[in-house]
Amino acid sequence: MHPILKNIRSQPDQGRAEEHNPELHCGIAGTGGLEEQLRSKQREDRFHKACPPAVDLNRDDTQLYGEGERDLRLKSSACVQLDRTPVTPEDFVPDDMGSRAIRQMEAAKLVRNGQHTRDVERWQHDTYCSHLTQLLVRPLTSLGVMYLADFLNTFVELPPNHTLTMQLVTIINHTSEPTLRRLLKDIGEKDAEGHLKNEWLLQLLSIIEMIFKDEPSERARLTALLTVTNEVALNFSKKASGGNYPTTDRLSKTLTYFRRMIVALLALAESLGCYTNNYCARKPEKRCRTQVEPSDESYMFSLKGALEAPESDEEEEEWIRD
C-alpha cells in the first residue's frame, strides 16, 4: 500500500459522534442512516404505548437464535391462523404445554413480528428505488461512472504511481460511505496468489458501467440495477453459506450490503461528474456584488494614473457601464 493511503484517517469527530449516538444496527446488518431511524421513530409513534415494540426477525440482536430459526419464524408467521375469540380466565389454567392463553399470545407475537419484518423489507426496497431514481436522473452520474470505472481499472493495472495515488486520495475524500471508503483505500491490495482482494468491486462497477452504456432510459437502468442487486446478493450469500441456499435473514443482510454499495458508488460518481461543469450565471452579477471596494491607497494610485495618463472616451464609457 502506498504510504499516503496508510495515513488516511476518517474525520476526528466521527468516532465521538458514534459513541454518543450509536447506530441501531451496524455493519452488514445496517438498515440505513438517519433517514431510516427517523422513519422508524415515526412508525413507533403510531403504536399504542401498551403494545410491545415490534421485532425485525432478520436483524434482531437482542437474543441469539438457532441455525435457521430466524428463517423458520418468518415463514411460519405467514401461516399461523390466530384465534380471535376473547381470552377467559379458564385459558390461563396451566397444562402440559403451559396454557392456552400463553400459546395464543406467543402466536400473536410471532405474527406481528413477521408482518413487521416484511414491512421493513418493503420499506427498504422503496427507499432503495427512490435513491436510485434520484441518482439516475442527474445528468452527470453517467459521466462519473465512466470516469470512476476507467480510473480504478487503470490504477490496479499500472505499477504504483504517485500521481494516480494522489488522484485516488481525492476520490476517497469524496466518499461518504465508510465501507466503500475502506474498500477504495485497499483497492490495489493482492493476496498471496497475486489476485486482487477487492476484485468484486471492480466487476460490480463494470456491470454498472455496462448498464449505463446499453440502457438508454432511466426506467430501464433502474430495472437493470434492481436485477443486478438481487443476482449479486444471491450469488455471494450462497457462497458465504458454503454453497447451500441461504436463509432469508442472510439473504436480506447481503442484499442490504450491496444496496448500500451501489448507492454509494452512484453518489460518488455523481459528485465526480460535477467537476466537468463550470457553472456561470446567465446574467453576471454587478461588480459591487462580486468585488469589495478598493482601499484609499489603491484608489489614490488609480487616480494618480488617471491624471497622468487619461484614457480614451471608449474606455471611459466601458468603465461607466461596468
UniProtKB/Swiss-Prot annotation:
It comes from Snake adenovirus serotype 1 (SnAdV-1). The keyword Signal does not apply. Residues 1-127 are annotated as: Interaction with packaging protein 1. Part of the genome packaging complex composed of packaging proteins 1, 2 and 3; this complex specifically binds to the packaging sequence on the left end of viral genomic DNA and performs packaging of the viral genome. Interacts with hexon-linking protein IIIa; this interaction is required to promote correct genome packaging. Belongs to the adenoviridae packaging protein 3 family. It is found in: Host nucleus. Keywords: Host nucleus, Late protein, Phosphoprotein, Viral genome packaging, Viral release from host cell. All late proteins expressed from the major late promoter are produced by alternative splicing and alternative polyadenylation of the same gene giving rise to non-overlapping ORFs. A leader sequence is present in the N-terminus of all these mRNAs and is recognized by the viral shutoff protein to provide expression although conventional translation via ribosome scanning from the cap has been shut off in the host cell. This is Packaging protein 3. Induction: Expressed in the early phase and late phase of the viral replicative cycle. Pfam families: Adeno_52K. One of its GO terms (cellular component) is host cell nucleus.
